[in-house]
Amino acid sequence: MVAPEDPLVTYWLALPAYNEERSLPALLERCIPLARTLEAAGARFRVVVVDDGSKDGTIASAKAFEGRLGVEVVPHVVNQGLGAALRTCLTAALERAADGDVIATMDADNTHDPGLLPEMYGRMEAEKADIVIASRYAPGGDEVGLTALRKVLSRGASFLLTLMTPVPGARDYTCGFRLYRAAMLRRAADAWGQRLVEEAGFTCMAEVLLKLGRGGARVTEYPLILRYDLKEGASKMKMMRTISRYFALIRRIRAAQMPRVA
């Protein structure tokens, strides 16, 4: 897949970050050999970090990679939550991407392996998919370092969403590591506007997948081993609020008219 106006595919990695000065440098270091590999194969790799009003040195950590990795920083003046940061990530990436490009999102806490992106793109092309989920629940996927409670919440949310608001091809509805075709994502952004991401917290990842997948986007998965043991610092998830928001999201999605995006 190439953009007609450009012979090169660009991978745009959009990272929502909040107080990740301890984890972000390690993740960006892992991106450097990936960028070299992609460029040697005739592709390009760019990173956009959306800083969601961090109170630590997250911005400085990202800017330290401007020369080595071409990182751009898009700041929020105040903390607005993961949903707003994801919305800005998608908007910023689409402003920079050609229709033939691909846009990836992942957590900025170094629990996801950016080295999977070429394989995810290969799966996307082989299956003519619009979205590839890096999935803990695909054959070969796993979770390392998660508490039993977090595992129950993640698996329970995906089970409930599969039961109540299924998306063909999806097992892992909540993981933030995904690869999207830019052209499809642009159609979705045009159709939904700012309403593409309405959830403020962690449920925003499921929301986007439901709106795209139930709007006709073709979804597949690639196995992910989530390395939560590499995370520096405590989780920012508010457990009870997240659970209540999943039930509210299901009600809203089941009642909504889904515009076609693919």
PLM features per residue range, with description:
Residues 29-43:
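Short, acidic, metal-binding catalytic loop of nucleotide-sugar glycosyltransferases
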Residues 76-95, 102, 114-198, 230-237, ...:
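Acceptor/aglycone-binding surface of glycosyltransferases and processive sugar-polymer synthases
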Residues 9-15, 24, 31, 44-50, ...:
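Hydrophobic targeting segments
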Residues 1-11, 191-262:
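Hydrophobic helical membrane-anchoring modules
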